[in-house]
């Protein structure tokens, strides 16, 4: 049997005024990924699946994000915001191309899963013409109720229109829907706007399908999974749910989180085996951590690659472009950016390494700074394998420190250092006998008496 194809339409044209943000609502992040990106990543994306995203006329950034996440996404503009059904029909061209299953979702529900999208399609394969995603609300106030009889969906009843018995229903409408592609346009075109707001509501599709003598049904998911994000408070709630998911998944994969509730992960964080994450670690997007690595407390990592049995922190900041080789060590109060640090190299404390390549087993002393920026451009520092950089050294890029070379403590290095050489740049130390006493005596003579 040939697999059914699908078209998923993601509605992302909302203004999001309650977010009180200049950023379009669906671009706000949860676990380092935009709300929209979470939904697009969960939507079907096989060879026989298509994707359309409906955006507002003034939200080009939303379209750009959709294309970044899913290059196959077709972007459609809802010129006027006249309701959910009107938004779906903004993608009329995509619907008209045909699909076995039409899925409709919202760009502000980041917790929806690929598994739920798959389950939403199953009743269409078994004779239903329309499927609505529902959830059991802890407090159903304000939600549309799903009225079910004999296992079939008979109506979506908004709270203002619900009877006393219907108000007791806790099964609520999540807004996500699947429609048989053969009837989708016919059903959508029959939706009218004879209501107080003059808008076209997708929920009216249930009655239209039943009037056609066809079957509508419901599948259920958790309330968490269909949380819509309209305020910063709801954004924080979604972050909490997502972080719990990510932590549980990490621990199930063999990661040791010593205090899970204090560790923050990104949606794309990847781990090897036997990784240990100590309390109060923040991992941003683009981080991979290989087998046996340890991330000590109060470290912050973004777009960094951590090798096997490497160590980071405590109190380390790894910025984008950092790569640690196997067994490398980044210690306390070290910041790195665009830095390749090869196997076994050590940067133990109080150091900035930017735009640099540190060779295998090199040792970088406390207080070393790679001076990579001249006010206009960044420049690279190269430190050879086995090199030793003494404490409190400044390496003024562009500069190369040779294999096995030494740099004496306190040096300001502006020229390349050959392999195996020692480079020292200091003024001659002098000592002036008796100077301290003369200084104190002079200060005492000029000091004003203290007031009593």
Curated annotation (Swiss-Prot):
Q: Give EC number(s), comma-separated.
A: 2.7.7.23, 2.3.1.157
What reaction is this protein's catalytic activity?
Answer: alpha-D-glucosamine 1-phosphate + acetyl-CoA = N-acetyl-alpha-D-glucosamine 1-phosphate + CoA + H(+); N-acetyl-alpha-D-glucosamine 1-phosphate + UTP + H(+) = UDP-N-acetyl-alpha-D-glucosamine + diphosphate
Q: Where is this region: N-acetyltransferase?
A: 254-452
How is the cofactor bound, in the record's words? Binds 1 Mg(2+) ion per subunit.
Residue ranges, annotated region (Pyrophosphorylase): 1-232
Entry-linked CDD domains: GT2_GlmU_N_bac, LbH_GlmU_C
Annotated Gene Ontology cellular components are: cytoplasm; membrane
Spell out the PROSITE patterns in the cross-references.
HEXAPEP_TRANSFERASES (PS00101)
One Pfam family name is: Hexapep
* Molecular function GO terms recorded: glucosamine-1-phosphate N-acetyltransferase activity; magnesium ion binding; UDP-N-acetylglucosamine diphosphorylase activity
User: Binding residues for UDP-N-acetyl-alpha-D-glucosamine, per the UniProt record?
Assistant: 11-14, 25, 78, 83-84, 144, 158, 173, 230, 319, 337, 352, 363
Q: Where does acetyl-CoA bind?
A: 366, 372-373, 391, 409, 426
Q: What does this protein do?
A: Catalyzes the last two sequential reactions in the de novo biosynthetic pathway for UDP-N-acetylglucosamine (UDP-GlcNAc). The C-terminal domain catalyzes the transfer of acetyl group from acetyl coenzyme A to glucosamine-1-phosphate (GlcN-1-P) to produce N-acetylglucosamine-1-phosphate (GlcNAc-1-P), which is converted into UDP-GlcNAc by the transfer of uridine 5-monophosphate (from uridine 5-triphosphate), a reaction catalyzed by the N-terminal domain.
Q: How does it assemble?
A: Homotrimer.
Cross-referenced NCBIfam families: glmU, PRK14353.1
What protein name does the entry list?
Answer: Bifunctional protein GlmU
Q: Which organism is it from?
A: Rhodopseudomonas palustris (strain ATCC BAA-98 / CGA009)
């Amino acid at each position: 049997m040939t697999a059914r194809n699908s078209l998923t339409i993601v509605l992302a044209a909302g203004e999001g005024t309650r977010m009180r943000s200049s950023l379009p609502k669906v671009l706000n992040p949860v676990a380092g990924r935009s709300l929209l990106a979470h939904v697009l990543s969960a939507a079907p994306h096989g060879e026989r699946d298509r994707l359309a995203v409906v955006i507002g006329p003034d939200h080009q950034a939303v379209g750009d994000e959709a294309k970044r996440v899913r290059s196959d996404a077709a972007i459609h503009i809802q010129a006027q915001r006249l309701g959910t059904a009107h938004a779906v029909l903004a993608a009329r061209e995509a619907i008209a191309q045909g699909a076995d299953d039409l899925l409709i979702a919202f760009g502000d529900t980041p917790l929806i899963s690929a598994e739920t999208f798959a389950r939403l399609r199953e009743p269409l394969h078994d004779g239903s013409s329309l499927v609505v995603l529902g959830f059991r609300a802890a407090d159903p106030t304000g939600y549309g109720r799903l009225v079910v009889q004999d296992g079939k969906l008979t109506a979506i009843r908004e709270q203002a229109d619900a009877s006393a018995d219907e108000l007791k229903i806790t099964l609520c409408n999540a807004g996500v829907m699947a429609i048989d592609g053969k009837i989708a346009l016919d059903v959508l075109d029959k939706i009218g706007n004879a209501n107080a707001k003059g808008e076209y509501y997708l929920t009216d599709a249930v009655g239209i399908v039943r009037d056609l003598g066809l079957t509508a049904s419901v599948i259920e998911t958790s309330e968490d999974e269909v949380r819509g994000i309209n305020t910063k408070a709801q954004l924080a709630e979604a972050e909490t749910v997502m972080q719990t998911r990510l932590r549980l998944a990490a621990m199930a994969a063999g990661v040791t989180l010593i205090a899970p509730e204090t560790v923050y992960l990104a949606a794309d964080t990847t781990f090897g085996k036997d990784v240990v994450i100590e309390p109060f670690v923040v991992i941003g997007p683009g981080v991979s951590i290989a087998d046996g690595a340890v991330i000590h407390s109060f470290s912050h990592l973004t777009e960094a690659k951590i090798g096997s049995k490497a160590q980071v922190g405590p109190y380390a900041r790894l910025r984008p472009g950092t790569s640690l080789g196997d067994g490398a060590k980044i210690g306390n109060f070290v910041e790195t950016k665009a830095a390749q640090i090869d196997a076994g190299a050590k940067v133990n404390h109080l150091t900035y390494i930017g735009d640099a390549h540190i060779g295998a087993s090199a040792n970088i002393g406390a207080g070393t700074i790679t001076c990579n920026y001249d006010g206009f451009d960044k420049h690279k520092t190269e430190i050879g394998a086995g090199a030793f950089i003494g404490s409190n050294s400044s390496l003024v890029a562009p500069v190369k420190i040779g294999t096995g070379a030494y740099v004496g403590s306190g040096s300001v290095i502006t020229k390349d250092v050959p392999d195996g050489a020692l480079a020292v740049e200091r003024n001659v130390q002098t000592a002036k006998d008796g100077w301290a006493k003369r200084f104190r005596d002079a200060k005492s003579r000029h000091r004003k008496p203290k007031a009593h």
